[in-house]
């Protein structure tokens, strides 16, 4: 895998076969040109959206590479890129959301398999969550490398199925929402668990419960099944997306529902959500008839 690859176009989908024989340096130069062009166009679209505020205007849609066919959670880095992953392999990919370019990928030792559903970053640690509540902790690495990891079992796997994980920096804790209750009696609520860092003390875990009627609001949903959760960088509220309902809710850390609405645009299977520090909403869709994509919108608080 080359350190930088474009994810919208195939490398050899070029006017001539000679282009496929370019040197790595020439290909890198071409990618830099594409990146510059896309950033310029994105800036133009942002300016146009800001000239007509009021709606979450679509800014760009990037097709993801085959290894992200089942793209899942999203986690923003301090440098403005985003970490994401496929939900069947313990491999992390870094993408520039402003250009749709895949920068690198690395994995946990042994190419771990499993139902990995969410990702977050806390300091220098990366966390991957399995649907059974087990959390894998490891470090960022260079392209193609494998890194050691540790595993923490939250003990919540018998109670819930999970697909969301976020780092709440103000409280130094991990936040995860129950997607589906596994007991026979569904409590009809949105339940959000919070685990203080460092992990290890189950007794320190807390949760908030939000009645499902408040979550649904005026929407025609019958329930709400969280597929990812992230923190709004501006007001620190929880932004929770649900693939089945194709909508999202904004909830305060105290459990108050601020808003509940359908996602903008056309989303076949939205699995990840994040908000950048410059007010761009990112939504990832895994392949479902159409290829996997990362869509950008102007975020409207």
Q: In which residue ranges do the predicted regions lie?
A:
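Sequence/structural signature of beta-propeller domains
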Residues: 21-301
């Amino acid at each position: 895998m080359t350190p930088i690859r474009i994810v919208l176009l195939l490398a050899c989908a070029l006017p001539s076969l000679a282009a496929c024989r370019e040197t790595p340096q020439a290909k890198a130069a071409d990618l830099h040109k594409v990146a510059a062009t896309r950033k310029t166009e994105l800036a133009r679209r942002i300016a146009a959206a800001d000239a007509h505020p009021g709606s979450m205007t679509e800014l760009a849609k990037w097709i993801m590479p085959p290894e992200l066919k089942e793209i899942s959670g999203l986690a923003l880095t301090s440098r403005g890129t985003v970490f994401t992953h496929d939900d069947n392999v313990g491999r992390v990919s870094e993408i520039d959301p402003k250009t749709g370019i895949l920068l690198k990928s690395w994995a946990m030792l042994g190419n771990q398999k499993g139902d990995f559903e969410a990702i977050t970053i806390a300091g220098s640690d990366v966390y991957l969550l399995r649907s059974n509540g087990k959390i894998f902790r490891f470090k960022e690495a260079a392209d193609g490398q494998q890194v050691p990891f540790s595993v923490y079992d939250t003990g919540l796997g018998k109670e819930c199925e999970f697909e969301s994980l976020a780092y709440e920096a103000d409280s130094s804790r991990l936040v995860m929402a129950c997607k589906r209750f596994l007991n026979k009696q569904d409590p009809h609520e949105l339940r959000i668990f919070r685990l203080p860092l460092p992990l290890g003390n189950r007794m320190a875990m807390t949760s908030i419960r939000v009645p499902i009627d408040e979550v649904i609001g005026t929407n025609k949903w019958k329930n709400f099944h969280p597929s990812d959760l992230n923190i709004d960088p501006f007001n620190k509220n929880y932004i929770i997306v649900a693939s089945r309902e194709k909508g999202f809710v904004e909830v305060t850390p105290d459990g108050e529902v601020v808003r509940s609405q359908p996602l903008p645009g056309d989303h076949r299977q939205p699995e990840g959500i994040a908000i950048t520090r410059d007010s761009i909403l990112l939504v990832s869709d895994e392949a479902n008839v159409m290829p996997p994509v990362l869509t950008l919108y102007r975020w409207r608080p």
